[in-house]
Amino acid sequence: QHCDAAELRFVIDQGAAGVVAPYIETLEQVNVLCDAARRRPLQGEALRRFAGESGGDRPELRSYIHQRTADTLLLLNIESEPAIDRIDELVSVEGVDGVLIGPHDLSCNLGIPEAYDHDRFSEALREVVAATQRHGRVAAMHFMGCGGLELAMAWRELGFTTWVQHADVYFAARGVADEIGRLRGEAGASVNVVI
């Protein structure tokens, strides 16, 4: 699966506060991402040497890198059964801030498409929350309106503390649709609107 440290470094260097790393399933992927997010700008041999050193070998560099990356957010997008099976291992890595569940993809990968009230789906969510709580990480949910607010509240009760509520395109489209509706209501249904 795609896990590109160079892309992660690029978006953070361009000003992103952090990243949601898509479709994470392995410890190797997490380690690559943590190195890129938490040890920028080091790469290659310099990164390998730095990662293997004790804290006292280069205190100025350690301090600089810690200050430079302390506010960088790294969330692992958990969307598959292998990720659920390894969730404790994945979130135990120092440098991971938390996970973001993609409910649609996870439900499909569990073989129960959009069955958000299915016992298998709920059990997977409980496993994720338990692991994040054990390791002091954030449990976030990508909520695109699936199942309504009642379902969102049920997920909150499970222990999810952070939400991605829709997306910017959704809000823009909804705003435009509302404006068109008002315009047609005031000007008559026969008005043509060009966007």
Where do the PLM segments sit?
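Expand to "…catalyze enediolate/carbanion chemistry for C-C bond making/breaking, isomerization
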Residues: 1-195
